[in-house]
Amino acid sequence: SGAKAAPKFLSKPVITKLATGVRFEVSMSCFPAPTITWYKGSTALSEGGRYTMMKTVDGANYTLIMEISNVSAEDGGGYKVNVKNDQGEGNADLTLNLEG
């Protein structure tokens, strides 16, 4: 129950370095519930292996999280999360810089 709305990002994406990996966190809102796809470059990522994908839902507000474990230099670069529902879609871009 709520007004239909296309995906809208609520804040800048946050990248947090963990002990052995990184966490990407994106806050957004939309209604109805979206389809969520994470990408590295143009390649869609799937859950499993070193990738853990989670979301928390509070009404129409979503926190989208992806964690990458055992990060190596090859993991650096551009990522995005695509969020799509029947009202539209949005993308949030994240850049993972791995310095020494």
Regions found by a protein language model. Give the residues of each.
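Immunoglobulin-superfamily
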Residues: 1-100
